[in-house]
């Protein structure tokens, strides 16, 4: 299982936004929508072993968590408007501390970063930062990972403190800063290649060069 957390600091926490203006009226919700697509879609299918968690911290009610479960997800297309519509439907639910299903495979609840991290107890937490350890060096040893990414503003000092206190390793996918959705694609590629080397992907045939 792969879980991916994206923190949206300005992402609106009510459903009264326009699907035609996700960058503006929805508080850069377009960034989160692109992350959802990069995390879940394959060329001719969907990654059923991936969950995406969107932590929305914008107005008017900061602290909403929307979860996309790849195993059960339906009605999602690769375009931003499609994922934006599912997010909007989730936000129109009267979310509380317990998960509420809005559409098949999409759940919503209230919560903050600490409560979200607590739900991953026992998992391998990996926090992406430009100066982190090269993920390529450890991708083959990682099991049951949870990746945490910021939006276009990164993460705050307080959020980083919470991540490090929770035991998150700091990793990087390359020497330059990339968009969050591009980082997700690179993460998947490294893990896919590692699984292919181990024979865990049907038809996979990638040989690792001799050291």
From Swiss-Prot:
The keyword Transferase applies. Belongs to the methyltransferase superfamily. TrmY family. It catalyses: pseudouridine(54) in tRNA + S-adenosyl-L-methionine = N(1)-methylpseudouridine(54) in tRNA + S-adenosyl-L-homocysteine + H(+). The lineage of its organism: Archaea, Methanobacteriati, Methanobacteriota, Stenosarchaea group, Methanomicrobia. Specifically catalyzes the N1-methylation of pseudouridine at position 54 (Psi54) in tRNAs. Homodimer. Its EC number is 2.1.1.257. One of its GO terms (biological process) is tRNA methylation. SUPFAM superfamilies: alpha/beta knot (SSF75217). Disulfide bonds: none annotated. The keyword Cytoplasm applies. It comes from the Archaea. GO terms for molecular function: S-adenosylmethionine-dependent methyltransferase activity; tRNA methyltransferase activity. Keywords: Cytoplasm, Methyltransferase, S-adenosyl-L-methionine, Transferase, tRNA processing. S-adenosyl-L-methionine binds at residues 128, 150, 183. This is tRNA (pseudouridine(54)-N(1))-methyltransferase. It is found in: Cytoplasm. GO terms for cellular component: cytoplasm.
